[in-house]
Amino acid sequence: MKRHPIWIILFTIVIDTLGIGILGPILPQLLGNPNSPHYLLGRDAAVGSGYIMFGFLVAVYPFMQFFSTPILGQLSDRYGRKPVLALSLAGTSLGYALFATGIVIRSIPLLFLARALDGITGGNLSVAQASIADVTKPEERTKNFGLIGAAFGVGFIVGPFLGGLLADPSVVSWFSASTPFWFAAMLAAANTTQVLLQFDETNTHIRHVPMHLLRGMANIARAYAIPDLRTIFLTTFLFNMGFGFFISFFGLFLIHRFNFNEARIGNFFAWVGVCAILTQIFTTRRVAARFSEPEVLRFSLLGVASVMFAYLLAPAPLWLFVIAPVSSTFNGLSLANMGGLLSRSVAPQVQGEILGIGSSIQALANALPPLMGGFFAASLATEVPVLAASLTMFVAWLVFTILYRPVRVAALT
């Protein structure tokens, strides 16, 4: 029985974000916590080397995505969404299975291979978004893309919670650090089967266009070549870089500052996900009705930089849960208004090109902080990557406040 493609696509997005969420509670324990029973390095290994290796392992996925996602998008235009989506999901399933195997046999190279494979085939999200655009009428596009945000939220709430729960042997005796990844692999495999059997091709305008294998790098050069959008792109890059520092290393910070285990890290990130959804439901639209995007960004970027710093000052774990709603509010407002401002600044016929450029900027911005943060944590302290998140967000606010000038419609040269 065929189902409406939107619901299959939304399930795909939930699976994709759920897998990312599962990593949050587990990964810091594998390479960043010598006191964890899941620690994969020898007891005589330098703790700092684990931090650096942790950073490289986190960076592998977005670095591979930087090159592969534009290629998968082109393949979906050329051969259709269905085969590319199925291939991406199969790669995701195999990647999680290899990651679980790497934990079981204590093979760090296999963990890197697994994350690289998932990154190379990780075009699920971009192809899913294109599929929704294929089947959505213009007047329903905002509503259906809002469902994407809701699917993101579900994945980011359930993922960390499941990651902490399924890795806890006190819940079920045979649970371990590998269990969440076996579970994610099975879900992705089921989703692959669902796409193959129940998903109708949505791309009715398949075009045999030339392939550009280095589209990601070309997109970065293109961003610099559009003068009217440089400030927005630079702000987006810095914001995502700051968020990359935070999301990559906050679990490590929680372990060493407050002695959090997998379950407590999972509960914290699940709470952040709940706050993010509540922001989307109750705050974003109300603020958008009263203020323009530039007005919102001038206080939300400064707000998120300040709240990131506030995490460092928290005297007890309870304060983290108090700060999280404020952090999620400023973060959600910044994301929504940067996307809205970029969309309003270009003509409708080039929205696709601008979306591709933005995706490449985000992938590169997500790849750099783990590489840098591992060295920061190893040579200074585990708090330093969180401080770097705050400072990078502050620079994003400075750049936008000082350099941004409104444009009616950007001239694409």
What is the meaning of each model-derived region?
Residues V14, G95, I108-G123, W319-L333:
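Hydrophobic core of transmembrane alpha-helices in multi-pass small-molecule transporters
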Residues I26-Y51, S248-R264:
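Short amphipathic helix-loop junctions that connect adjacent transmembrane helices
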Residues F67-G80, T279-E293, A377:
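Helix-to-loop junctions at the C-terminal end of transmembrane segments
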Residues A90-I105, L302-P315:
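C-terminal ends and interior cores of transmembrane alpha-helices
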Residues F112-F152:
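Cytoplasmic helix-loop-helix junction between adjacent transmembrane helices
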Residues M186-H205, A396-Y404:
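C-terminal membrane-cytosol helix-exit motif in multi-pass small-molecule transporters
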Residues D200-L234:
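Juxtamembrane intracellular "pre-TM" segments in multi-pass secondary transporters
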Residues P294-M338:
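C-terminal transmembrane helical hairpin of 12-TM major facilitator-type secondary transporters
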